[in-house]
A protein has these predicted regions:
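Soluble FAD-dependent oxygen oxidases
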Residues: 2-18, 22-597
Length: 597
C-alpha cells in the first residue's frame, strides 16, 4: 500500500469507530413557533392579561369578507362590497391587504389576534409576548405589500394604523446629535400614517415638500424601510435617504432611537433594508425640502401602425429622453404595449407650464410630422400647476376622495391607481436598467430588448425609480442607504405585471381562470427575459419584485446584503421579525413557523 493511502486509511479509523456514536447522538429539534390549539399556545387568561397591558386594544382578526361567509345578505357583507374599491377602507381593517393575493404565492390569511397599538409601549408589550411564547409575529401599517408580508395566518399582528400623528419641525436635530448634525426642517410621524397624511400637512398646509411614495395610501414606515420612490424622486432622491431618525421596538422588546449618532447600524438598515425584518418602527422623522413653485405633467398615447414604425418611435423617444428628460425635472413613466402602443404618463418638478410645454414640443412635432405612422388615441400635451395644490382635493379631477362618514377630509387616491386596489396578481417582475443603455451606441440593444419583451407583456419604464440623472446630493444620500446601489446607476426601473380584479377569500367570486393566469405569469417572465439578456445581473426593487426571485438577496440589496445580515443577527438573532424574502428569511420555512438553520 502506498504511504499516502496508508495514512488516509489510518486517519479514517477513528471516524469509523465513532460513526455509531455519532449516529446515535440525538439531534436538537428545530425551533418551531406555535399555532392555535397546539401545546404552548397562550391560554385565554394570558390573552386577557396581554389585552390589559395594551389598554384593551387586543382584537380578534377577521378576514375582509368574513361577514359574507356568515350572512351574505347582511349589512357587514354589503359594506365590504361597497368599499372594496377604497384603499383607505381596506387599510382600516386589521385583516385587510391592499392586494388580494398572488397566483401560487400567497393568499390573505388573518392573524389570530392584533394589537391596535397606540404607542411604543403597546408595541413593546406585543413583541415581548410573541417572543416569550414562540408566536409568529406580523407587522402592518399600510398593508400595501405585494409580497403579502403583513399577512400571516395564526400570528399576532402589531397593527400601527392608529399611530398616525404628524408634527412639523423648523429645525430638527436627531437625539444625541447636537453639534454633530446640523438642524434641518423635518416632519415626524407615527408609523401608521399614510403618505397623503404627510403631503397634506407638509405641502398643502405648510408649503414644503417631503419625499414619499406616489400612491397616497401607502404607509410611510413601510415605504421608507423598502427604500421608497415617489413621482419626484428624480429631483429629491429616495424616501429612505430622507430618514433622520426612527423610534423602534427591537426583538428584545426595548424602545430604541436609531439615527446617525445612536444605533447607526440599525438606522442604516432601516433605510431600505426591508420592512418587518429588523424592528417595529413606531415613529419616523423625515427631512423636508423647499417646495418647487410648480409640479407638472406630460401625457399622451399613440399606436404605431407597424413594427418598423414602432421601432422608429422608440428610437426617437430615447434620443429625446437622453437629451431633454434625463435630469432631475422629469419622473414617472412611459408604457410600451404588445400592440405597438406607447403611453406617456410623466410628471415634472420645478418647471412652469411654458417651460414644460417647450421641453416636449420637439417630440410632439416629430409625432405630428409622422402621423401616417401612428394613430393618436390620447392627444399629447404637457403643463404644470402650483405645486402646493398637487395633493389638494379641492378642484382636483384626478383624486378620488374617501367619502365614508368620518374619513379625514384630505384622504384621496389617484384615479390612475384604482386598478391596483385589491388586485390579484398573476405575475410581477422588475429590474433596474443602467444609464449606460442611454448612450448612443447602446440604445439599439435597449430598443430591441423592449420590442421583444413588449410583444409578450406591457412594460412600464418608471424613470423616477432609477436615480441616475438625479442631483449628486440625492445620489450620495441614496448610497448611504441599504438599497441596492444599482438604483443609483439606473435611469429607470422596468416593471412587468399582470393580474385581475379583487379575489379576496370569502367574496364568492369565481376563482381565477388558472390557464389564463398561468399564461399571464409566463408572459411576465417572457417580457423580462430580453431585458435580463442585456442586464444579466440586474437589481430589483424589493417592494415591486418577483415573489419567486431565486437570487433575491443580490437582486434587492446587492453588495449591501452581508452587512444587513450581520445587523439582523445582532438585533434579532432568533428571527422574531420575519417576512417573505426579508433579510434572514432563508433560515426559515416558507410559513415562518420552523427554523431551518
Amino acid at each position: 500500500m502506498h504511504r499516502r493511502r496508508l495514512l488516509e486509511a489510518a486517519a479514517a479509523l477513528p471516524l469509523v469507530a465513532l460513526a455509531p456514536a455519532l449516529a446515535a447522538a440525538p439531534q436538537p429539534a428545530p425551533m418551531r413557533r406555535v399555532r392555535p390549539g397546539e401545546p404552548g399556545w397562550p391560554s385565554a387568561a394570558e390573552w386577557r392579561k396581554l389585552d390589559e397591558a395594551v389598554g384593551g386594544t387586543l382584537l380578534e382578526v377577521r378576514s375582509l369578507f368574513s361577514a359574507c361567509e356568515s350572512d351574505p345578505q347582511g349589512s357587514g357583507c354589503r359594506d365590504a362590497f361597497a368599499n372594496i374599491q377604497n384603499p383607505f377602507y381596506i387599510g382600516d381593517q386589521p385583516g385587510g391587504t391592499q392586494v388580494s393575493g398572488w397566483l401560487n404565492a400567497w393568499t390573505p390569511a388573518p392573524s389570530a389576534y392584533a394589537i391596535k397599538a397606540r404607542n411604543s409601549a403597546d408595541v413593546a408589550a406585543g413583541v415581548s409576548f410573541a417572543r416569550e411564547r414562540r408566536l409568529r409575529l406580523a407587522i402592518k401599517g399600510g398593508g400595501h405589500s405585494y409580497q403579502g408580508t403583513s399577512s400571516a395566518a395564526d400570528s399576532l399582528l402589531i397593527w400601527t394604523r392608529a399611530m398616525n400623528q404628524v408634527t412639523l419641525h423648523d429645525a430638527f436635530v436627531p437625539t444625541g446629535c447636537d453639534g454633530k448634525v446640523p438642524p434641518a426642517p423635518a416632519v415626524s410621524t407615527g408609523a401608521g400614517a399614510m403618505w397623503i397624511d404627510l403631503y397634506d400637512a407638509v405641502t398643502t398646509r405648510a408649503g414644503r415638500y417631503v419625499q414619499g411614495g406616489g400612491c397616497t395610501s401607502v404607509g410611510v414606515a413601510g415605504l421608507v424601510q423598502s427604500g421608497g420612490f415617489g413621482s419626484f424622486s428624480k429631483g429629491f432622491g429616495s424616501a429612505a435617504a430622507g430618514l433622520l431618525e426612527a423610534e423602534v421596538v427591537t426583538a428584545a422588546g426595548r424602545v430604541r432611537i436609531a439615527n446617525a449618532c445612536s444605533e447607526p447600524d440599525l438606522y442604516w438598515a432601516l433605510k431600505g433594508g426591508g420592512g418587518g425584518s429588523f424592528a417595529v418602527v413606531t415613529r419616523l422623522t423625515l427631512r423636508t425640502y423647499d417646495l418647487p413653485e410648480f409640479f407638472g405633467a406630460a401625457w399622451g398615447k399613440l399606436r404605431a401602425r407597424s413594427e418598423a414604425a414602432f421601432r422608429r418611435l422608440l428610437t426617437r423617444f430615447f434620443e429625446f429622453y437622453a437629451a431633454s428628460l434625463f435630469n432631475p425635472h422629469w419622473g414617472e413613466q412611459v408604457t410600451i404595449g404588445p400592440d405597438y402602443t406607447f403611453e406617456i404618463s410623466m410628471v415634472s418638478q420645478g418647471m412652469d407650464p411654458k417651460q414644460a410645454g417647450e421641453v416636449w414640443q420637439p417630440f410632439f412635432d416629430w409625432i405630428h410630422a409622422a402621423s401616417h405612422d401612428f394613430t393618436v388615441t390620447d392627444k399629447p400635451g404637457a403643463g404644470a400647476r402650483p405645486a402646493r395644490h398637487w395633493w389638494d382635493i379641492a378642484g382636483s379631477h384626478s383624486l378620488i376622495p374617501d367619502r365614508r362618514a368620518g374619513a379625514p377630509a384630505h384622504h384621496a387616491w389617484w384615479d390612475g391607481d384604482q386598478e391596483q386596489v385589491g388586485a390579484f396578481l398573476h405575475g410581477y417582475d422588475s429590474l433596474w436598467l443602467p444609464a449606460t443603455l442611454l448612450e448612443a451606441a447602446e440604445r439599439p440593444r435597449l430598443i430591441e430588448a423592449l420590442l421583444a419583451g413588449s410583444r409578450q407583456q406591457e412594460i412600464g419604464l418608471h424613470f423616477n425609480k432609477g436615480l441616475a440623472g438625479a442631483p449628486p446630493g440625492a445620489i450620495t444620500a441614496a448610497l448611504d442607504t441599504a438599497t441596492n446601489p444599482a438604483a443609483t446607476r439606473a435611469f429607470a426601473l422596468a416593471i412587468m405585471a399582470s393580474g385581475e380584479g379583487p379575489l379576496y377569500p370569502g367574496m364568492g367570486r369565481a376563482p381565477a381562470d388558472e390557464a389564463t393566469a398561468h399564461a399571464d405569469a409566463r408572459a411576465v417572465d417572457q417580457a423580462s427575459a430580453p431585458l435580463r439578456g442585456i442586464v444579466p445581473e440586474a437589481g430589483s426593487y424589493v417592494s415591486e419584485s418577483n415573489y419567486f426571485n431565486a437570487r433575491w438577496q443580490q437582486a434587492f440589496w446587492g453588495t449591501n446584503y452581508p452587512r444587513l445580515r450581520a445587523i439582523k443577527d445582532r438585533y434579532d438573532p432568533d428571527g422574531l421579525f420575519l417576512v417573505h424574502h426579508g433579510v434572514g428569511s432563508e433560515d426559515w420555512s416558507a410559513d415562518g413557523f420552523t427554523r431551518l438553520a
